[in-house]
């Protein structure tokens, strides 16, 4: 499964090279935008978050289409994205909630017991401690957006349940995806030189379509495992693995 997911992700990345350009523009270049005025910074952050979510929904559909014998056009992927905006926003909020819970656990485990801003050494310690926690949070939602966009699921709780079942069955792959996704959040917490931060941001943006491709491949190869099984007495249980 692991080799197949990596292979399918590379096929998507190779056949949709413009996806990397899109993610660099939306997710990499904004690191050079550092407005000092909060009146500008807050709306800009909200705008970038919204744009990032829309781009993710679009790329899920567009990259997955590259695996089809007759790949659909970008216009078809845009239409799929528009139909998934509502549940996609709810899925994004659910993911933010998972990350918030991971952050709270991290602060309890690695945060300073004293008030005031953390010294540089404590910030590094907290960032390193948060990385696996964020990675696990992302891992359990590794195919959440795929369930919404590719599976047409409109109930986010059901999409999350399906993603949990995939993570339980294929946790090493999901954890790898989650740790790579979490690296961007951790990197932003580290105190590093700006040029290094900018280079890493662009590198992660270039890798983002490949991570989406991994989640797409995992979702498409595990669709039979995502539905609970009817036991015959009216109750449901997780599918056999």
Model-derived segments and their meaning:
Residues 1-241:
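Hydrophobic alpha-helical membrane segments
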């Amino acid at each position: 499964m692991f080799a197949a997911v990596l292979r399918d992700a590379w096929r998507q990345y190779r056949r949709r090279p413009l996806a990397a350009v899109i993610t660099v523009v939306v997710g990499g270049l904004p690191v050079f935008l550092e407005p000092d005025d909060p009146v500008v910074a807050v709306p800009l952050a909200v705008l970038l978050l919204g744009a990032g979510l829309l781009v993710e929904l679009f790329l899920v559909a567009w990259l997955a289409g590259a695996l089809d014998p007759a790949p659909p056009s970008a216009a078809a992927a845009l239409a799929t994205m528009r139909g998934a905006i509502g549940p996609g926003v709810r899925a994004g909020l659910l993911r933010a909630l998972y990350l918030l819970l991971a952050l709270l656990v991290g602060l309890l485990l690695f945060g300073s017991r004293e008030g005031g801003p953390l010294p540089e050494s404590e910030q590094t310690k907290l960032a390193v401690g948060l990385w696996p926690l964020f990675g696990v949070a992302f891992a359990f939602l590794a195919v959440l957006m795929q369930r919404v966009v590719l599976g047409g699921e409109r109930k986010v709780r059901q999409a999350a349940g399906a993603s949990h079942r995939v993570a339980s069955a294929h946790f090493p792959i999901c954890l790898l995806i989650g740790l790579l996704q979490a690296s961007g959040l951790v990197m932003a917490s580290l105190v590093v030189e700006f040029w290094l931060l900018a280079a890493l941001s662009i590198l992660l943006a270039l890798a983002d379509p490949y991570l989406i491709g991994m989640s797409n491949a995992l979702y498409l190869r595990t669709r039979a495992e995502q539905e609970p099984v009817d036991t015959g007495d009216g109750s449901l249980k997780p599918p056999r693995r």
